[in-house]
């Protein structure tokens, strides 16, 4: 696909994706908040009148200089409102635009998914693995909650998370960090949208069809829809984080990115639960602070651990210069554009040292220490052909020692290149 079309698709569909997601997640948060704050009517009202048996709860909300008085009621066939609002297209639009973005940015060029330092999979196989995760992940998740295990929410939720993190471990062996986080986010987003289509809308259609056929109110359909709606509610925070994960290269480019992903997902679900508990749990806010502190501490430990392979093999600690350069590579957001595999933003630095690159002005340059240093301090003069001149200059931002450390790290990404090729 022509790069210009990909960029236009990126702009249009990314904005639509974000806009629809805001509307969808906003609905999820609001409806659950209203459910939690409904005031269940007493046996008799203040005037001594018997309680309305069809009234499930009331809620008064102050906004815009007035009060919204909300009632949740049992609906009967003779009292179906003429104008009834359904909430589904926010979900469908989010999922469809997300799928288009995955196709344009990752599936159209499967190498953007892969970590070439870990796998020799073909781009086509990588795309198939990604697609299989969306469909297979939904089938596993839905199967868990349809099974007898689904009647035990804590066990079913644990099984669902274990299945999700198993998938993350698998993709962590073949995908680069950015693609890994977005893949798991896309899988969770698929669970949510499929919940809307299959269970929430499906049961609501059954409910309305039953009423229009004159049958009495049946609470089973509403309970089934509400259960999956609550699933979606708890997935909102993790999906938002993973949706924005391209902005967190320090995390997705880490050696221990799969455990970091797991900690983030669990912590954000726990925080959502604590927020829901605020009306009956006195210390909910302190527990949120504690969850954030513990999660940040665990992630901090993982960020400073040697790579898993080094720990498993008992390897010697890495060169301090390489380790410092790697930290700079992550904290300076280099990994955002120069990730493993190929990128549409900047060239991958994995295996680039010692190669000859064609520049935008038609000249050719050997990628050695001198080239990397010039690229860092004066990137406009070293733009590789096919990429936009978007790299910022680090002149005045990095001292000579930091530049040397970054060069050492980039050199280490091509270990087969002899040290003698380094510029003096």
Ranges and model annotations:
Residues 392-423:
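C-terminal capping alpha-helices of c-type cytochrome domains
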Residues 297-323, 406-411:
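Extracellular/periplasmic ectodomains of large secreted or surface enzymes and adhesion receptors
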Residues 326-327, 336-378, 392-397:
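Gly/Gly-Pro-rich "capping" loops immediately C-terminal to redox-active cysteine motifs
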Residues 233, 334, 380-384, 415-418:
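Generic structural signal for secondary-structure transition and capping sites
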Residues 1-312:
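Polytopic transmembrane helical bundles with strong interfacial aromatic enrichment
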Residues 321-324, 368, 372, 402-406:
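Stable alpha-helical elements in mature extracytoplasmic
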Residues 6, 219, 308-330, 365-366, ...:
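Electrostatic cytochrome c docking/interface patches
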